[in-house]
Amino acid sequence: MKWIEVQVTTTQEAEEAVTNIMHELGAGGVVIKNPNDVKLLAQSDNWDYLDSSLFEEEGNIKVFAYFPIASDTTDKINILKDRIVELKSFGIDIGNFDVKVSEVDEADWENNWKQYYKPLKIGKKIVIKPSWEEYVSQGEEIIIELDPGMAFGTGTHETTKMCLEFLEDIVMPESIVFDVGCGSGILSITSSKLGAKEVYAADIDEVSVEVARQNVELNNLQNVKVFKSDLLSEFRGKADIIVANIIADVIIKLSAEVPKYLKEEGLFLASGIIKSRKEEVLQKVEEFFEVLQIREEGEWCAILSRKK
């Protein structure tokens, strides 16, 4: 089967938004080539081999989307271009935006990359395991089964990794967790496996909602509820922890709303914040929260705060 490969060159800041647009347009797969991710993974012991050419590229991110050849494929590509350019109106830097389109065979991308994706340990005991890989838990490790590439959130991106490390420290046995913009469901699944009592996960993107449901089922979890919601609009009740791994503009918008959905002294974990906008986000967060800790990795930061 032939597929259309759409290669978008953009910035780290725009990476997540571009990926989400691709999924919303029905991409059969999305692959992100990020030099910083390669450097991060190289620090672990989960790789048998790392090609030196992977370290030669610096700067821009390349995001590849794969669409089946159909009568509306050209229209989808044009919509993709328009929506990426539109990101500038939301204050997102798309950099030297470039799009290349080519035709590829399914075998060139659908399965070959899997041999290089290995179980990844994050924090003290979290292990992200691709669904096709065999792995035996060591000691107190908790295994998160995931089919990467279907929606944002595989554990390799700095924003997701920092959230997982924070969750390992803050989730308690009686915790109720709200995951806003859940993507693949990785943060919700991890919260449940860390012992949370109830977890509610939502995304505005129907593809992400379906993917998160599949991953929850893959992990045999009964206490994680996944649904469609525009940010917090469909959430009910109050949580001990609200996590949002989104983008700076949305974190700023959410900051005034999150306290209404948090219990007294509840925690707000915000990630997906590019370093260049950290101070802007902090200024808004500090209006409603006491900032407890800030973590930085690569070009990104995550903020843990407590309701005032």
Swiss-Prot record:
GO terms for molecular function: protein-lysine N-methyltransferase activity. Signal peptide: none annotated. Its EC number is 2.1.1.-. Keywords: Cytoplasm, Methyltransferase, S-adenosyl-L-methionine, Transferase. One of its GO terms (cellular component) is cytoplasm. GO terms for biological process: methylation. Methylates ribosomal protein L11. NCBIfam families: prmA. This is Ribosomal protein L11 methyltransferase. The gene is prmA.
